[in-house]
Amino acid sequence: CRIARRGGVRTIALLDNVIPHEKRPFDKWLTRYFLGSIDGFVYMSEQVHSDLRLFTKTKPAVFSPHPMLDGYGEPLPRGEACAALGLDPALRYTMFFGYIRDYKGLDLLLDAWGMLKREGKLEGHKLIVAGEYYSGKERYAEQIDALGIRGDLVLMDRYISDGDVAKLFSAADLVVQPYRHATQSGVTQIAYWFDVPMVVTGVGGLRELVPDGKVGYVTEPDAAAIAAEIDRFYREGKAAEFRANILRFRERFTWERMIGNFRSLYDRIAGTQPGQKR
C-alpha cells in the first residue's frame, strides 16, 4: 500500500477485524503500520469502527455490513438435505457451524444442551456441531462425555465442503452463535442466505446483525441464558415467523449495497493526495 501511494494511488481497506481474536506479539505495531498506509476504510460493524478509532481518529470511514454469503448455492428442500447428510428429517436440528475456536463459545452451547437434556427438553432434537477444531478437541470430548450428551449430538468435526454448507443450513432449524466476543460473523450471513433463524450472544457486531425477537434472539454469553432462548424458540414455535422476517431484513445485506458504499467512500477521497485528509 505504501508503495502504491508513492505513485499517487489512493487506498481503501475493507475491515473485518482491526484487533485479532487471539493476541500475538507486535499486533498493535503491525496494525498501526498497516492502517497508516490506508486513505479510507469500509468497516462491517460498529465494534470494528470503535477499534479503528483507537488507531486513527480522522481518516474517512463508512459502515457497510457484510453481505450475505450467497456462493453456496440455493437452499435445498429440507428432506433432501437431511437425506444427503444421513439425518432423520423427523428431528429438529440446532446447529453450531464454523471453525471451533475458544472465543466462539462452543463449551457454553454444550453446557446449555446438557441443561436442556436434564430438563427433559431434548426429545426429538439433535445438536449439529459442524466444523474443524482450531484447538482443544480433547477438552470438548471430555465435556461432552461428562454432560452425557454424546447421543444427542451430530458431530461433523472436519472440513466442511461448500456442497455440505448448503445441505447443513437447509437441514438446520436454528443456528446458535454462542460467542464470547466477536466483531461480526460470516455464519450470520450464511444463515440469512438460507433463511435460518438464529440465537446469538449480544457481543460485538452480532447484536447489530440479528434484530432481537425478529429473526432470532439475542442473549448473554452464558449457558443458562443460551439454553433458555433455544427452548423459547422451539416452545413458542417461532420458526415460520422468523423465516418470514429474514426475507425482509436480509435486504440490508446485498452486495450491491456494499458496492455503493465503496463508491461513496471513493468519491470522498478522490482528488486528494494519498494520506491527505478530507
In which residue ranges do the predicted regions lie?
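Short hydrophobic beta-strand element within catalytic cores of glycosyltransferases
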Residues: 174, 191, 197-200, 210
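Nucleotide-activated donor-binding/catalytic signature segment of Leloir-type glycosyltransferases, i.e.
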Residues: 140-163
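Conserved acidic donor-binding segment of nucleotide-sugar-dependent glycosyltransferases
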Residues: 212-224, 232-238
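Conserved donor-binding/catalytic core segment of Leloir-type glycosyltransferases
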Residues: 87-104, 110-113, 128
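Acidic donor-binding loop of glycosyltransferase active sites
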Residues: 167-183, 196
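A short helix/loop element that forms part of the nucleotide-sugar donor recognition site in Leloir-type
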Residues: 73-87
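Glycosyltransferase donor-sugar binding loop
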Residues: 126-139, 158
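Donor nucleotide-sugar binding/catalytic pocket of nucleotide-sugar-dependent glycosyltransferases
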Residues: 36-75
